[in-house]
Amino acid sequence: MSSSPSFGLLAVAALLLALSLAQHGSLAATVGPRVIVVGAGMSGISAAKRLSEAGITDLLILEATDHIGGRMHKTNFAGINVELGANWVEGVNGGKMNPIWPIVNSTLKLRNFRSDFDYLAQNVYKEDGGVYDEDYVQKRIELADSVEEMGEKLSATLHASGRDDMSILAMQRLNEHQPNGPATPVDMVVDYYKFDYEFAEPPRVTSLQNTVPLATFSDFGDDVYFVADQRGYEAVVYYLAGQYLKTDDKSGKIVDPRLQLNKVVREIKYSPGGVTVKTEDNSVYSADYVMVSASLGVLQSDLIQFKPKLPTWKVRAIYQFDMAVYTKIFLKFPRKFWPEGKGREFFLYASSRRGYYGVWQEFEKQYPDANVLLVTVTDEESRRIEQQSDEQTKAEIMQVLRKMFPGKDVPDATDILVPRWWSDRFYKGTFSNWPVGVNRYEYDQLRAPVGRVYFTGEHTSEHYNGYVHGAYLSGIDSAEILINCAQKKMCKYHVQGKYD
């Protein structure tokens, strides 16, 4: 029995429509995965892993770049792989186990080295050359340490509501009786090393109550380990992803269709019935829920439009918190001219201009014979440097090095690497910092879902914002919130924090 012509035409029309929808990425808008994860950095991969473990396997991960890992990303520099972003496992050898440490040190066996800052007093260079007297510097370090200890005691007495919070600088003024805080070149560079080198913002903007003491070190230990493995620190993210995403055994490449790279999310529509996500290539995907793991800097930008707009309380939480900038500048030289040996890995440049190429690291152990130095800048210096040419930055650095080592024949650097996280629209900075005036309740609003839109990222980690382990743990925590709603119908989120 033959089909009627009208039925055949309908079938052809339906087929053409399906092909057209599939070509434009819109077919997914009618069937869609249950959960879309925006971003394949540590928190996004961690969240998707926890969802998968809970039986939510109909996932789609949309990543804006051509790789996973986010701010954990290596690049080749002068023949060696170095880390553009996260580099350390911070918080090791304490009472609790940092969840990243066993993956790095035991499972993957990534090359890592304990960073030893105990000898800084003998490695502080004057602005006009030579080193400061070690005893003098040691006394200034001990003074800074004692002021910080007084700050810890003061922090513990502040009202749980956060109403009495103050900046770290205000605390320093109270204890040092100096109106501007540390003011001499040595005091400023020690201060910069203690705070800016950790938080990427100065003490005048950083919350005392929420950063002193720092939970990362109180919980996990004071030691930090520098990852210097040619596989990259990002190998941790690939390892986690490989536990639930299909991976090619030979190449190690993720081949699971649930991970889509080069998908720049530009719009998220949400309603009581579900979510729709649109990407820059005009693909459209629908789901029951969306987990947004984009950085705080991206949320503060106009890259992703939410429809309807996020409620005022959510927007205020996003804009109240700080997205800091931490820039690691690598330089390659034809030969070494700096001191090496025990206690020489880290050295400081005590400029009269606070934060001007102040913290240096040499890699005798990590990259032997590579002749590479690393200098770190943050905050306004980072933003300034991102907007000038690498040649101009190199010229500034060479001038500093020749001041530090006036008796040496200091050659020009042959290569320079200047990451530009602040300028990158997919990050808009490196990690979050807790500013003064934001209490724990307001902070937890960063993590709180809005309808079917959930949020994760290091900036949503209750105790460990700014750290790799914070991103990892926040992914798990945010996934649990979504699981409670999707599987247990416990969808009402109570904004809370340690103050409750």
Swiss-Prot record:
Glycosylation sites: 105
Localisation: Secreted, Extracellular space, Apoplast; Secreted, Cell wall
Mutagenesis / variant outcome for changing residue 328 to M: Abolishes enzymatic activity
Cofactor(s), by name: FAD
Keywords: Apoplast, Cell wall, Disulfide bond, FAD, Flavoprotein, Glycoprotein, Oxidoreductase, Secreted, Signal
Functional pH dependence: Optimum pH is 6.5.
Co-factor remark: Binds 1 FAD per subunit.
Sequence positions that bind FAD: 42-43, 63, 71, 87-88, 265, 427, 458, 467-468
Catalytic reactions on record: spermidine + O2 + H2O = 4-aminobutanal + propane-1,3-diamine + H2O2; N(8)-acetylspermidine + O2 + H2O = 4-acetamidobutanal + propane-1,3-diamine + H2O2; spermine + O2 + H2O = N-(3-aminopropyl)-4-aminobutanal + propane-1,3-diamine + H2O2; N(1)-acetylspermine + O2 + H2O = N-(3-acetamidopropyl)-4-aminobutanal + propane-1,3-diamine + H2O2
InterPro entries: Amino_oxidase, FAD/NAD-bd_sf, Flavin_amine_oxidase, Flavin_monoamine_oxidase
Subunit structure: Monomer.
Family of this protein: Belongs to the flavin monoamine oxidase family.
Function comment: Flavoenzyme involved in polyamine back-conversion. Catalyzes the oxidation of the secondary amino group of polyamines, such as spermine, spermidine and their acetyl derivatives. Plays an important role in the regulation of polyamine intracellular concentration.
UniProt protein name: Polyamine oxidase 1
Organism: Zea mays
Name of the gene: MPAO1
